[in-house]
């Protein structure tokens, strides 16, 4: 069995085990607190009885992450998730706890690691500058999510007995509503927009609740805007892919089958990233969206302009993209974001990001549909109606207020159904103006006698 030996301020759990070759060894495990040593002693004794004892090895967290990425990530992740998770591992996991043995990571170590993350500065990427100096609670949550999954696989592989990240305590971050434009501001922006490409993108984002990557990945074969469709209010489009800038190493690791199409780089020199067409992250993002007539006519006009370019420009690369560049090549999201920023500055518009148009879209669709969550979810592609409720609860609250007002008008306004009456307005009590009274007494001396008699009677 196991026993505890105290060494200075440390506590050691000592026990014997037999390796796979049948050799017997003595093992010492050191802990800083006696309670941790007692807990480990109990685990060892139970493990030896049930033949499930896992003896700590020398595998470090960074070595575990290599196996985790190779054996799990390459089978389960898409190119965008693969790239972002590799960045989290390289920037915030390996530098901080990569050298620690995985068996040394317990719940106390996890709490200390989370505390350390909150004091860690954000690492900027080649293409994105970090808005916050230190790691946000959302990014810390993403890091812990990766580690929870990795250590879950370590339990499955028999490397550790339990997952220390399962009950990690994270700061619950309240959702901050994104600033959005109202309908009047969006009309003003569209009227001020002189860039045809940006004009189409803004209409698709607002009218169809599309993400920018989905707009850039939309192809003409998924857009149904024939005259008969428009006349019958049946114009629609189908979202099933998006444009994404992926790292070449991610595509190489996952295989080219992980993306639908790889666009050749326009640059002659080698690049670390490349634009690709890929499936959306979630199945709920694949959806059919009906198009308002005006937007359908805008798309028809845009397509006619594209067809003229194809005829006049023999170098046009036809990828069948709706929002292609003038040469037919795919458009990077940074191009649209830059044009959108210029429009805001020129038209003196409130500062919002392009994605806010999608939030404006969901907001007005909830209003126009009297809070129909399922209908709005069908257009936005959110994974669940709960996400709509969480993000747009303030809109639903307004509708609930209106509902209470209608309830009052339709039900309680009937006097036969209401015995409780609203309180009657208080009658203002007459006030005595002392100066006026003195002037009246001076004019009518007999009034003074009458007033004195009245006061005398009231005092009895």
Identify the meaning behind each predicted range.
Residues 225-229, 233-236, 241-286, 295, ...:
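C-terminal secondary-structure termini that scaffold catalytic or DNA-interacting sites
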Residues 3, 69-159, 175, 329-335, ...:
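N-terminal core-binding DNA-recognition domain of tyrosine site-specific recombinases/integrases
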Residues 172, 180, 243-245, 380-406, ...:
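Catalytic-site neighborhood detector that most strongly recognizes the C-terminal catalytic loop/helix
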Residues 7-112, 304-317, 397, 412, ...:
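N-terminal DNA-binding module of tyrosine recombinases/phage integrases
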Residues 123-126, 133-137, 141-143, 156, ...:
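Basic, Lys/Arg- and aromatic-enriched nucleic-acid-binding interface segment
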Residues 222-231, 350-351, 370-393, 419-420:
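Short, polar N-cap/turn motifs at the start of nucleic acid-interacting alpha helices
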Residues 156, 203, 207, 214, ...:
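C-terminal catalytic core of tyrosine-transesterase DNA break-rejoin enzymes
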Residues 14-17, 267-276, 282-349:
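Active-site/catalytic core of tyrosine-dependent DNA strand-transfer enzymes
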């Amino acid at each position: 069995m196991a026993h505890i030996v105290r060494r200075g301020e440390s506590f050691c759990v000592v026990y014997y085990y037999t390796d796979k070759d049948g050799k017997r060894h003595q093992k010492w495990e050191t802990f800083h607190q006696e309670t941790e040593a007692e807990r480990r002693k109990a685990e060892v004794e139970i493990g030896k009885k049930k033949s499930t004892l896992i003896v700590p090895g020398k595998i470090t967290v960074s070595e575990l992450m290599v196996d985790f990425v190779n054996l799990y990530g390459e089978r389960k992740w898409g190119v965008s998730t693969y790239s972002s998770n590799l960045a989290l591992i390289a920037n915030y996991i390996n530098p901080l706890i990569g050298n620690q043995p995985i068996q040394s990571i317990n719940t106390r170590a996890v709490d200390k690691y989370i505390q350390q993350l909150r004091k860690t500065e954000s690492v900027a990427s080649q293409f994105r500058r970090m808005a916050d100096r230190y790691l946000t609670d959302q990014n810390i949550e993403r890091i812990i999510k990766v580690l929870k999954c990795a250590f879950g696989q370590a339990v499955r592989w028999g490397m550790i007995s339990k997952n220390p990240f399962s009950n990690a305590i994270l700061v619950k971050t309240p959702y901050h509503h994104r600033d959005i434009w109202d309908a009047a501001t969006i009309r003003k922006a569209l009227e001020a927009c002189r860039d045809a490409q940006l004009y189409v993108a803004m209409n698709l984002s607002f009218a169809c609740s599309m993400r920018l990557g989905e707009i850039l990945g939309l192809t003409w074969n998924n857009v149904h805007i024939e005259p008969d469709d428009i006349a019958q209010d049946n114009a629609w489009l189908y979202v099933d892919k998006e444009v994404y800038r992926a790292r070449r190493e991610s595509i190489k690791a996952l295989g080219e089958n992980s993306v639908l199409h790889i666009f050749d780089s326009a640059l002659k020199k080698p690049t670390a990233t490349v634009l690709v067409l890929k499936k959306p992250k979630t199945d709920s993002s694949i959806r059919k969206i009906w198009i308002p007539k005006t937007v359908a006519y805008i798309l028809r006009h845009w397509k006619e302009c594209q067809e003229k370019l194809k005829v006049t420009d023999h170098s046009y690369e036809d990828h069948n993209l709706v929002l292609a560049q003038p040469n037919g090549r795919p458009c990077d999201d940074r191009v649209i974001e830059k044009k959108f920023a210029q429009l805001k500055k020129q038209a003196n518009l409130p500062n919002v990001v392009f994605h806010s148009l999608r939030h404006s879209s969901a907001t007005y669709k909830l209003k126009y549909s009297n809070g129909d969550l399922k209908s709005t979810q069908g257009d936005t592609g959110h994974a669940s109606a709960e996400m709509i409720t969480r993000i747009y609860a303030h809109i639903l609250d307004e509708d609930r207020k209106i509902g209470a007002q209608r309830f009052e008008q339709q039900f309680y306004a009937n006097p036969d159904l209401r015995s409780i009456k609203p309180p009657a307005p208080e009658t203002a009590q007459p006030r005595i103006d002392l100066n006026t009274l003195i002037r009246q007494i001076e004019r009518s001396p007999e009034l003074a006698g009458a007033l004195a008699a009245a006061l005398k009677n009231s005092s009895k």
